[in-house]
UniProtKB/Swiss-Prot annotation:
GO molecular function: ATP binding; proton-transporting ATP synthase activity, rotational mechanism
UniProt organism field: Burkholderia orbicola (strain AU 1054)
Membrane topology: Peripheral membrane protein
Protein encoded by which gene: atpC2
Residue intervals passing through the bilayer: none
Record protein name field: ATP synthase epsilon chain 2
Keyword rRNA-binding among record annotations: no
Alphabetized InterPro entries for the sequence: ATP_synth_F1_dsu/esu, ATP_synth_F1_dsu/esu_N, ATPsynth_dsu/esu_N
Cellular component GO terms held in the UniProt record: plasma membrane; proton-transporting ATP synthase complex
Family: Belongs to the ATPase epsilon chain family.
Keyword line: ATP synthesis, Cell inner membrane, Cell membrane, CF(1), Hydrogen ion transport, Ion transport, Membrane, Transport
Domain of life: Bacteria
NCBIfam families: ATP_synt_epsi
Gene3D superfamilies: F0F1 ATP synthase delta/epsilon subunit, N-terminal (2.60.15.10)
Length: 152
């Protein structure tokens, strides 16, 4: 019994994988689909998500990020046509760029945020002092017969 299947993954941009795989997991519209050799024929849309496959010759797990598409399973193999896709190294590079960008943004805002936090703390302290003064003044002006709990 054959333990691998022909798998082709293509996108508008490029052919991403063409070879034999032990299995592939794709994000189907109704949930994750695990496809093994000799799977029943199937034609379905896929939703955005991660495609995971195990390369038959090497046993290496590979991951791709897809932005939707179509999956066809036939006797001849599996074909995934993705609207758009990224290989894991491209995805890692994208994440690295995004992390650097976020860190740069944070550094640029850091001094400003601290200044705002300090201003907020000062404003709160001033407000609390004004509230304390208000209650102190209100208590001084209150006549002895106006005290809460006294019968009038």
């Amino acid at each position: 019994m054959k333990t691998s299947m022909k798998l082709d993954i293509v996108s508008v941009e490029a052919a991403l994988y063409a070879g034999d795989a032990h299995f592939v997991v794709v994000p189907g519209e109704s949930g994750e689909l695990g496809i093994y050799p000799h799977h029943a024929p199937l034609l379905t849309r896929i939703r955005p998500g991660v495609v995971t496959l195990v390369d038959a010759p090497t046993g290496e797990h590979r991951r791709l990020l897809v932005a939707g598409g179509v999956l066809e399973v036939s006797r001849d193999g599996v074909t995934l046509i993705a609207d758009h896709a990224l290989r894991t190294p491209e995805l890692d590079e994208l994440r690295t760029r995004e992390a650097r960008h976020a860190a740069d943004d944070w550094r640029q805002r850091y001094a400003h945020e601290n200044r705002r936090a300090f201003d907020f703390a000062s404003a709160r302290a001033e407000l609390m002092e004004e509230i304390r003064r208000f209650f102190a003044m209100a208590l001084r002006q209150q006549a002895p017969h106006d005290k809460p709990g006294s019968a009038g």
